[in-house]
Amino acid sequence: MAKYTNDELLEAFGEMTLVELSEFVKAFEEKFDVEAAAPVAAVAAVAGAAAPAEEEKDEFDVILSAVGDKKIQVIKAVRAITNLGLAEAKALVDGAPKAVLEKAKKEDAEKAKAQLEEAGASVELK
């Protein structure tokens, strides 16, 4: 029995019509008692189950998008939120866009966003 390489098989399949390929798949399924559609259905079921979990997000990243013209107030707000020192808070603000908080609870993230926006910064939650 001759052994064919993947390239040789792909070349042979490439020369077949869709009808011929469909017949081949049916014959393959019968001979080896497998079903070609089963893995696709399982993947679709897993993907469908994962979607609702994504909607119920409970951890957020607070991203400082832009500082605005009140840089000192934004640095003070960053220090209050993160307990960073002055130099670290200034470096964070100067490096915008940057994460101020990561994996924060929704309540804490919204509170931090409000504080930063009140100080004059542009903020987004991800």
From Swiss-Prot:
* Gene Ontology MF annotations: mRNA binding; structural constituent of ribosome
Protein family according to the UniProt entry: Belongs to the bacterial ribosomal protein bL12 family.
Q: Which domain of life is it from?
A: Bacteria
Q: Which GO terms describe its biological process?
A: translation
The gene coding this protein: rplL
| NCBIfam families, sorted | L12
Keyword Ribosomal protein in annotation:
yes
Please describe the quaternary structure of this protein: Homodimer. Part of the ribosomal stalk of the 50S ribosomal subunit. Forms a multimeric L10(L12)X complex, where L10 forms an elongated spine to which 2 to 4 L12 dimers bind in a sequential fashion. Binds GTP-bound translation factors.
Which CDD domains does the UniProt entry name for this protein?
Ribosomal_L7_L12
Q: What does this protein do?
A: Forms part of the ribosomal stalk which helps the ribosome interact with GTP-bound translation factors. Is thus essential for accurate translation.
UniProt KW Chaperone keyword: no
An example Pfam family from this entry, by short name, is: Ribosomal_L12
GO cellular component terms given for this protein: cytosolic large ribosomal subunit
Q: Write out the entry's keywords from A to Z.
A: Ribonucleoprotein, Ribosomal protein
Name the record gives this protein: Large ribosomal subunit protein bL12
